[in-house]
Amino acid sequence: MKTKLREMLKFPCFFTYKIIGLAQPELVDQIIKVIQIQIPGDYTPQVKSSNRGNYLSVSITICAKNFEQIETLYHDISKINMVRMVL
């Protein structure tokens, strides 16, 4: 799968992450903080709450310069304690 994704993308390109995490006030700030380390910029994530309000879905788009940035951010975002899934 990694090879197909790598072949499909032409850099620089926009790439959207969808992150599912616990509905904590600091979740979005933590995600943006991790992204800012790799790719500084202004980010306006789209945030949706689950039906019961236990989880948040955060969609955030970055401009990646290479595939390694996409992979690194995927792993770094996954390490956030409140994050349950990164797509």
From Swiss-Prot:
One cellular component (GO) term of this entry: cytosol
Gene3D superfamilies reported for this sequence: 3.30.70.260
Taxonomy, superkingdom: Bacteria
Which residue stretches, if any, does this entry annotate as coiled coil?
none
InterPro entries (UniProt xref): UPF0250_YbeD-like (IPR007454), YbeD-like_sf (IPR027471)
A Pfam family cross-referenced in the UniProt record is: DUF493
User: What HAMAP family has UniProt attached to this entry?
Assistant: UPF0250
Please name the NCBIfam families in this protein's record.
PRK04998.1
- UniProt cross-references to PANTHER family, sorted A to Z: UPF0250 PROTEIN YBED (PTHR38036:SF1)
According to its UniProt record, which protein family does this protein belong to? Belongs to the UPF0250 family.
Kindly provide the name given to this protein in its UniProt entry. Answer: UPF0250 protein BUsg_472
Name the source organism: Buchnera aphidicola subsp. Schizaphis graminum (strain Sg)
